[in-house]
Design a protein with these regions (language model features):
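Residues embedded in well-ordered secondary-structure elements
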Residues: 11, 157, 177-179, 200
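Extended serine/threonine-enriched, polar tracts that run as long, contiguous segments within proteins
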Residues: 180, 185-203
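Bacterial Sec-dependent N-terminal signal peptides
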Residues: 1-30
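Extracytoplasmic
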Residues: 161-163, 183-185, 206-208
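A domain-level signal for the mature, folded cores of soluble proteins
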Residues: 23-177, 195, 215-291
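Residues in well-ordered beta-strands of folded domains
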Residues: 169, 189, 212
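Short secondary-structure subsegments characteristic of cysteine-rich extracellular domains
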Residues: 205-218
């Protein structure tokens, strides 16, 4: 009975400490004095640029493409860093997580590996359960009985630094009303590295959830992204996606079998197939205005 009480005490203390730490990470303490020579107001009051109205009759051609944004590429680092929240910036994953868990302005959708059509809405408790787990195999020395080790569950949380890729679902289309080939992102899905029960890497990816991109745009428009060479002209996450300031590769295109590239190509052939799909879109646009 005594050991049970000690175990419960350690569990409660550890949970309280970790919860307090998590709150500090998610919401850093505001500074006593302004951190800068002027007050930044442009980003926090910005609004996402409305999409141009699109009629079905104006879409002459369209193709759905699924991409992968690898955050290990240098051009994609503004989406990955900072790995810890600071006063004026967050990583893309922290922005999504805060908006989903704290503000409720972004909806997450479950079963990302088999469904990307935003059908299985997740509650806040389901999101929290997905991102947080407890390791019940951890032990700690009994403070009242030195030399004796007892169970001490450890909280494991999926942090921003663990998210290394994103799936992007988007539609390319030709609008004859404006005579332009345009693209609109439909959804984003963060990926983490899949690990075994012992914590070893498997080399595979684990999809967390899908978010509907148009719903994310107002949130992204108010979050700064680091810009090299000039801190006074920083962009937002909305700018990054609107201006296509990221690198990616194609993992799937709309097809009769609904297959991903890796299901029928491997290795170098898969890379070449990805480039072929990208080139097909480029050639289509080029041929439209080639005389």
């Amino acid at each position: 009975m005594k050991k049970v009480k000690i175990l419960l005490t350690l569990f409660v203390v550890a949970f309280a400490a970790l919860t307090s730490y998590a709150q500090e990470v998610l919401a850093p303490k505001p500074p006593k004095y302004p951190d800068g020579v002027y007050t930044k107001e442009n980003t926090r009051t910005r609004r996402a640029i409305p999409y141009t109205h699109l009629r079905e009759a104006d879409v002459m051609w369209s193709k759905r493409v699924w991409r992968v944004i690898d955050l290990r590429e240098k051009i994609n680092h503004p989406l990955y860093y900072p790995d810890q929240i600071i006063l004026d910036r967050k990583s893309l994953f922290d922005v999504i997580k805060d908006a989903a868990l704290k503000d409720g302005t972004i909806t997450c959708f479950d079963q990302p590996g088999i469904d990307d059509e935003f059908r299985y809405e997740m509650t806040k408790s389901e999101i929290d359960k997905l991102l947080v787990s407890w390791d019940s195999t951890a032990t700690a020395e009994d403070p009242n009985n030195p030399g004796t080790y007892i169970s001490a569950p450890v909280k494991n949380e999926i942090a921003s630094i663990s998210v290394w890729k994103y799936w992007v679902k988007e539609d390319w289309f030709f609008d004859k009303q404006r005579s332009v080939l345009d693209v609109r992102i439909i959804g984003l899905c963060p990926l983490v590295e899949k690990k075994t029960e012992t914590g070893e890497s498997t080399g595979a990816d684990k999809a967390l959830f899908w978010v509907y991109f148009p719903e994310c745009r107002p949130v992204f428009a108010n979050q700064e992204v680091y810009m090299r060479h000039n801190d006074a002209e920083r962009r937002t996450f909305e700018d990054i996606f609107w201006k296509r300031m990221f690198s990616s590769y194609v993992r799937k295109e709309s097809n009769v079998y609904n297959r991903s590239i890796v299901e029928y190509k491997t290795g170098l052939d898969a890379l070449l197939e990805s480039e072929r799909i990208k080139n097909d879109v480029f050639v289509y646009e080029h041929d439209l205005f080639h005389f």
